[in-house]
Amino acid sequence: VGDVQSGFSVGQRVSVSPSRPCGGCKYCHEGLPNHCLNMRFYGSAMPFPHIQGAFREILVIESSQAHLLAPSTTLAEGALAEPLSVGLHAIQRAGGVFGKRVLVTGCGPIGNLLIGSLQAAGALQIVAADLSDSALACARRMGASETHNLKDEPEALARYTADKGYFDVMFEASGSAQALRDGLTCMRPRGVVVTVGLGGDVSIPLNLVVGKEIDLRGTFRFHPEFAQAVELLNRKVIDVNPVISHTVPVHQAVQAFELAGDKQQAMKVVLDFGVKDV
């Protein structure tokens, strides 16, 4: 712990934000730190040379990156502050979800943590769609009121298309262009669609976007939401434990990474470094 900082002491447990904006560029000054021109986000391949990751035994960080964990918050829960922050920023981009009907397509770790955040934010109804029964089971534990396996029932979302659509807000978290296209048919006029998981070029029915005045928005990373995520974890507002499918000792790290790559078995795999929670 450096001499020039205050508020932290040796032995305290913290969750570390990977977001490191410069604070001096035009976007930082405009309150858009996630779009910082000099961002040093851990593990980012966007700039060249690439930014180093943080998977190491010893890591020197800025004090602003450290967020204290409450005694009741486990290290495993603290490790999920980062993906939880992604969903919190997506909700901010949607402009609010209180009292609204929400569709979430894609129930991986990001999608399911997003569902937990939606429930905490007061969404009236949360409908989740995925191709995996285990992912949808996790979605129900995180707060989804209805789930649909589109592999078993490809036309399941058709029931929401009557009278120009049903949902006020949609979060597309699967990265599937087809999920985005199908979701647009379910949106009410002037609904908001936030693309969380899409990348690359896709084709969409622009006639639906125009004809129903749908607001299509992107979401990228986070910054202030990390502190909010840790606060929500510390206050037990959101239980992230259903997303932790496996805990593996660090000496079995290779097997843990292989397990994490098997989406049929794993959701979030936590490495146990043998450090006891308070």
How should each PLM-predicted stretch be described?
Residues 24-105:
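NAD(P)H dinucleotide-binding glycine-rich loop of Rossmann-like/cofactor-binding domains
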Residues 86, 110, 118:
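Hydrophobic/small residue at the entry helix of a nucleotide-binding pocket
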Residues 13, 101, 191-192, 215:
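Short glycine-centered segments of the SAM/dcSAM-binding site in methyltransferase folds
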Residues 104-107, 117-182:
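Adenosine-nucleotide cofactor-binding segment
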